[in-house]
């Protein structure tokens, strides 16, 4: 849509599709702006209400991201911006008492740093790798700003028989997210 020496803006247009009846409603425009020498990406989602105000009501509106991940499960991280900093988790958290994972490995992981574990030459690394095989894999996260003064973050494992569990509540989330793995972050 716009291209210059300092920024570029991409414009995507489409229509939401109702899951209930495949009805096409709410035309939308998404603009992504990328800036020179900046890690910031602006994301603007605009929708046009084209329904019948007497029978069509909005329960919620959201944006869903799917990101293919690479590398070890314990090196996959997600971070949401919150009103008091950030909510950060690993897809596989190496907090285990049996087998006991070395505290320095867990501390490195919780700082969002990549772990380079060599099971052949390091017993602590071998223990962490073995423990990771028995940990839940938190692969689905939801950030929901459900009112002007409340948001929640929930997480879930892949198993369809399992429900989401609460991760965090707060007042306002800026809507920022960082998803990282061994190949980089988004």
Predicted regions, residues:
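Beta-strand/loop-rich accessory regions of lumenal/periplasmic or secreted enzymes
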Residues: 1-186
């Amino acid at each position: 849509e716009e291209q210059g020496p300092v920024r570029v803006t991409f414009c995507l247009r489409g229509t939401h599709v109702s899951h209930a009846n495949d009805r096409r409603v709410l035309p939308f425009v998404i603009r992504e702006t990328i800036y020179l020498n900046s890690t910031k990406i602006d994301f603007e989602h605009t929708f046009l209400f084209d329904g019948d105000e007497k029978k069509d009501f909005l329960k919620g509106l959201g944006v869903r991201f799917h990101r293919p991940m690479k590398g070890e499960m314990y090196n996959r991280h997600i971070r949401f911006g919150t009103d008091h900093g950030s909510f950060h988790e690993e897809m596989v958290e190496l907090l285990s008492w049996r087998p006991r994972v070395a505290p320095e490995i867990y501390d490195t992981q919780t700082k969002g740093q990549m772990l380079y574990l060599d099971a052949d030459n390091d017993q602590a690394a071998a223990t962490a790798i073995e423990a990771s095989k028995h940990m839940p894999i938190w692969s689905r996260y939801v950030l929901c700003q459900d009112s002007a003064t409340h948001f929640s973050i929930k997480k879930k494992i892949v198993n369809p028989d399992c429900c989401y569990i609460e991760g965090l509540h707060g007042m306002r989330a800026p809507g920022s997210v960082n998803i990282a793995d061994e190949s980089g972050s988004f």
